[in-house]
Amino acid sequence: YGRTARLERDTRLAVLPIGYGDGFPRGLSNRAQVELAGVRCPIVGRVCMDMCMVDVTDLPGVRPGDVATVYGPGLTEQDARLQDTIVYELLCALSPRVPRIYLEQGRPIS
């Protein structure tokens, strides 16, 4: 959308099902990263209404259905800095479409 990214090499992109319709800010377009298989992967192009794309060129083992961490340790703080805001504002903006998994002592409780 809008041709906001210019790729300098052959690139493999993954499409993530989260976008500004879910409360993931458009201001993170071409700026933020997500985590896949323990590796930070840059967002490429604009965050769309229901999706965003990330560069997984250097992760040949990534497959459809793999888990991507959008907000997590280090990532949420980084995104807040990029948006000139606080972590709580980002988390409060997430829509009900985004499932919540609550942890107690590192284990999911709901």
Label for each model-derived stretch:
Residues 1-110:
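Active-site anion/phosphate-binding pocket segments in diverse small-molecule metabolic enzymes
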